[in-house]
Structures are given as structure tokens and as C-alpha cells.
UniProtKB/Swiss-Prot annotation:
Keywords: Cytoplasm, DNA-binding. It is found in: Cytoplasm, Nucleoid. HAMAP family: DNA_YbaB_EbfC. Pfam families: YbaB_DNA_bd (PF02575). Binds to DNA and alters its conformation. May be involved in regulation of gene expression, nucleoid organization and DNA protection. InterPro entries: YbaB-like_sf, YbaB/EbfC. This is Nucleoid-associated protein HNE_0371. Homodimer. It comes from the Bacteria. The keyword Aminoacyl-tRNA synthetase does not apply. GO terms for cellular component: bacterial nucleoid; cytosol. Its main location: cytoplasm.
Length: 107
């Protein structure tokens, strides 16, 4: 029975840690850049777009170029955000000794 109690304690500790990580992920921000810094976007948490900044020098250019740069900057920010979330999850689950091998969370 001691093993079961220990497993339950580990599960409760993991649940608390996962709630903490979820909050951290929701507050994490990532910047994406395209066109050598001419277009920047900022994302939060699960991909919420916070801001778009476009250098004034692009305003007279072809709108399709600006649209492509916005997409590229968004993609860059998304990749950075995904990496930050992955790093946070690795840190959060490191102390559980492989208790959940191959387990992926939906965020």
C-alpha cells in the first residue's frame, strides 16, 4: 500500500506542477521577426496575437509583400512560442523520473 500512496502523492505533485506550467505558458510571450526586422509580431500563450509592428518604409510597398512578411513573422513567433512551451514541459516533468514516457499534453 505504501507504493500506492507514494504514486498518489507523485500524481498530486505532478498535477500541481502542471497547473503551474499551464499558467506560465499562458503568460509566455514570443516575438517573431521577418524582413530583417521590418515586420514584428508578438504572440502570447497558445498563439494569441498581441501586436503587429510594421516599419513605415513598407507602407508604400506592394501589399502582398507586407502580407507575406506578416505571415513569416507570425510563423517565426509561433515556432519560438512552441519551443518555449516544450522547454517548460521538459522542466516541469523532469523530476518525475519518466513517470509519463511519451505523454504529450494538448498545449
Amino acid at each position: 500500500m505504501k507504493d500506492l500512496a507514494q504514486i498518489m502523492q507523485q500524481a498530486q505533485a505532478m498535477q500541481a506542477k502542471m497547473a503551474e506550467v499551464q499558467q506560465k505558458i499562458e503568460n509566455t510571450e514570443a516575438d517573431g521577426v521577418a524582413g530583417a526586422g521590418l515586420v514584428r509580431v508578438k504572440l502570447r500563450g497558445k498563439g494569441e496575437l498581441i501586436s503587429v509592428t510594421i516599419d513605415k518604409s513598407l507602407m508604400g510597398d506592394d501589399p502582398e509583400i507586407v502580407e507575406d512578411l506578416i505571415k513569416a513573422a507570425h510563423s517565426d513567433a509561433r515556432k519560438r512560442l512552441d519551443q518555449a512551451m516544450e522547454d517548460a514541459m521538459k522542466t516541469a516533468t523532469a523530476g518525475f523520473g519518466g513517470m509519463l514516457p511519451g505523454f504529450k499534453l494538448p498545449f
